[in-house]
């Protein structure tokens, strides 16, 4: 490697400083977006959990076979909803989902099951679209505007129709979920069919309620809402975790840039000192020659 002049080193330091300013600004933007996303997420979770509890309790009282969205059957065909981000610069955020989904696909295929994918997020779409899988739908740019229930109702309708028509025997969500402001985990959750874990105590508690017009009709109306809202929650979880991951990635990049600036500043000072020393020696030698 050719030795750099002090001017070249100074130019490199200035370039790193420009990059550092960009990563610092991106960190600030991600932090602001994270706070906004967390407010939505913390409002979403209680409703989602309560809706699940309500459906779980109602499902105890009816024959599962009487409602197509509750029917449990052998999983010969599985739909996977893979949720990634549209953008990068978020550390291992997207690769974690892609790798987890890939392992799950290979596991299911090794068991002789058919796998179909519904992809949400450009990173996942770009990775899986040319891998030879059956792609149900592929969505990009969904995070440009705030995720809404109109969008998730469309996706939920597609998944419910496939399950009812027996094109799939189970539906799973694969996405990142926020654990703390600085940590997230990649989760695989079953969306369909709904699995009830209600206890006998719950059975006694719910049996005292009078439900109009009937448990079956109320449950039927809630099930599609449950599917739509679970998708909504998964997207909000993913979006919030993305902002957290990007904020941390940009924070690390800013710190690394600072370390690089310090390193190159030392090199610059040494190079400048050497240049000054060389110039002084040349001046002394020239003066000696004149004598």
Curated annotation (Swiss-Prot):
It holds the Pfam family ATP-synt. Keywords: ATP synthesis, Cell inner membrane, Cell membrane, CF(1), Hydrogen ion transport, Ion transport, Membrane, Transport. It is a peripheral membrane protein. Gene3D superfamilies: 3.40.1380.10, ATP synthase, gamma subunit, helix hairpin domain. Its main location: membrane. HAMAP family: ATP_synth_gamma_bact (MF_00815). NCBIfam families: ATPsyn_F1gamma, PRK14110.1. Belongs to the ATPase gamma chain family. This is ATP synthase gamma chain. The lineage of its organism: Bacteria, Pseudomonadati, Aquificota, Aquificia, Aquificales.
